[in-house]
Amino acid sequence: MDQSSEGCMKKISSVNLDKLINDFSQIEKKMVETNGKNNILDIQLEKSNCLLKVMQAKEVSIKEECATLHNIIKGLQQTIEYQQNLKGENEQLKISADLIKEKLKSHEQEYKNNIAKLVSEMKIKEEGYKKEISKLYQDMQRKVELNEEKHKELIEKKEMEISELNAKLRSQEKEKQNEIIKLQLEFDAKLARVQTKSKSYQDSTVLPQSIYRRKLQHFQEEKNKEIAILRNTIRDLEQRLSVGKDSHLKRRRF
């Protein structure tokens, strides 16, 4: 019994060992397959990671593009809104322009009416000014005629004064000449009397002779001054008379 059991055990052990070897082979085969699959999975995982990175980069780029597009859309919306507002403003401006045109036409007509009124008033004032100018001219003519009469009388008066002064000047010159001749004769007579005296009195005659000469010279100077004053007065009157005649001629020309 022991041998049979021992043989049975050996048989069982042999069977279990073959099975174990077979199982190990299967396990090893599966492990190889699993390692191959793991390698493939690692490669696929690496590819997936690369693809994920690419997709993430694309996602970022797409998000940026979306943000850009969003901003563009927002800008377009604002542009559309602005254009709509402009359209409303244009409509309002058009209405305002029409109102301004109407007001301009009204003002233009009012301006034309005012111009016509001013032209009419200017014509009336022009006629009035012409009448006033004519009246002033007539008044000036009358004043000029009166001034001419007064000026003529003044000229005649000045001419008479000049004539009287000339006569006075001639009279004074004649009187001066007579006085000079008289003094000269007296001086000559006294000089002759003195010269007939003795030589002892010759020195005493020097003083009277010089005195007479100084008196004669002083008298001549005084008369010359009076004559110069009269001549200046006559010259001044003649100049005034000449100026008065020139102004009179100018007024007559005017």
UniProtKB/Swiss-Prot annotation:
It comes from Homo sapiens. InterPro entries: CCDC152 (IPR038827). The gene is CCDC152. Keywords: Coiled coil. This is Coiled-coil domain-containing protein 152. Residues 61-246 form a coiled coil. Detected in stomach.
